[in-house]
Amino acid sequence: AGLEHLTPLLAEGGVVAKGKVVIGTVSGDLHDIGKNLVAIMLKGAGFEVVDLGKDISPQAFVDAAVKEKAGFIGMSALLTTTMPVMKDVVALARKNELLRKVKIVIGGAPVSEEYAREIGADLYAFDAASAVDRVRAAADR
């Protein structure tokens, strides 16, 4: 309920789109406050954001990234029990020729940079600000 009040404060208006990010909370995880903050801040930083919501299956992430021609897939998990879904998304995305150049960014309380490397994600973000910084840096390359 409070996020709609934060949106205008966190978004920098009038920015040309720098890329497209498909974002969501993985299957089995209904916690989306962090994901929502990342989405708002990415929009404010000039990215087009396709927010899939929460409890999103690996196939839904991949299908959306293909449909939207996204440059990034962003995933969030708050529960350790849902972290393996991130690995499933990475594996499925890597098998899709259309997603060869897509960068995958993960974050959430139990997630670490080590886990990101272990599952083959391209980027790890420890909070919303670092998510924006890392996506922005990757988009500029």
Tell me what each language-model feature is.
Residues 1-72, 77-106, 110-118, 122-141:
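Domain-level signal for soluble alpha/beta catalytic cores
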